[in-house]
Amino acid sequence: MSGNSSTPNQGINCDPSYSYVMENFKYFVQVAYLAPAVFLYSRILYVVWVQHKKSYGYHPFFMVYSMVGLILVLLDIFITRLFVYVPQLCLPAAQFFISNPFLMELYYPLLNYLHCAQPFIQIFLTTNRMSSVLWPVDHEKFWKINFSRILILNLIAPFFFIWNTIISKKVLIFYFGGFYINYLKIIPWASMSLFLFIIRSAVVMITVVTTSITFWKMSHMKNRLKKSEGTLCKACAANSICFLVPAVFEAMKVLNTDWGKHWLAYLVQPFAWDVLNVGSPLVMIFASGQLRTHAFNIKRPVLKRSNSILVSSMTN
């Protein structure tokens, strides 16, 4: 099929007209910036779970968020982008998925589950950080007591948004020289674009409110440090932008049906996700001097008390 369309096809319709070299080049360019994100997520998880477990043991949302981000990037590298930009694999891979449809039934809902879980976790990350400055004495105790309930809520909530992807038929959509996996909606109005737009828009608004409160409260602390406040503000703004970019593209697909059906929408959308998935670990590393030191084994001088506010607020 032509590269300017993306429609479901029940058979195998790989387009041999695309240059293997050029398509493979596109793939490796994307891997070149996705791979560092895998390294950062992996390094963060190793530091948090293994190397400095005692220091980060009370930051569970931090760990869960990193794990979700890591899985999403790995799925992008080894499934989503691989079968779009490596035409050599189109025919054998398409035959394999058609012969084993349960893999499509597993992959597509999982992908959307993770995309939904990510913003839910972000909501609790930002509220957790806000509570650390509003109620510094009781905040840690509160989150420890309620973590199990909140985790269960995070695990269940995405199913209220991905149910249509679970019950609908999964298909291969042949695109450029390869293909990607999508679904034929049983319930036409229940689209993932609509649901993700709602979720991510809510996250952006909640993040703006909670981080504004956090920054306002920090500005009234007696031993505040201007540099720390500025770093926190920039980090929060960057994290909001990371969620805002995919939310904007989801909105374009929802509010403009012609754009939502255009092949270019399917081309651009993954790059909007990249802003979030690649940007998030960078924001984590940038925002926390403690995490940055541990992740890269950087020896640093003893920090003043006021600096610990930033570390605590961004890793909570």
Curated annotation (Swiss-Prot):
Subcellular localization, as worded in the UniProt entry: Membrane
A GO BP entry: sensory perception of chemical stimulus
Principal cellular location given in the protein's record: membrane
Leader sequence segment: none
A Pfam family recorded for this sequence: Srg
Membrane topology: Multi-pass membrane protein
Any one GO cellular component localisation term in the record: membrane
Tagged with keyword Transmembrane helix: yes
Annotated TM spans: 28-48, 60-80, 106-126, 147-167, 186-206, 235-255, 267-287
Domain of life: Eukaryota
Residues in coiled coil: none
Gene Ontology molecular function: any one: transmembrane signaling receptor activity
Protein family (similarity comment): Belongs to the nematode receptor-like protein srg family.
Protein name per its UniProtKB record: Serpentine receptor class gamma-8
Gene for this chain: srg-8
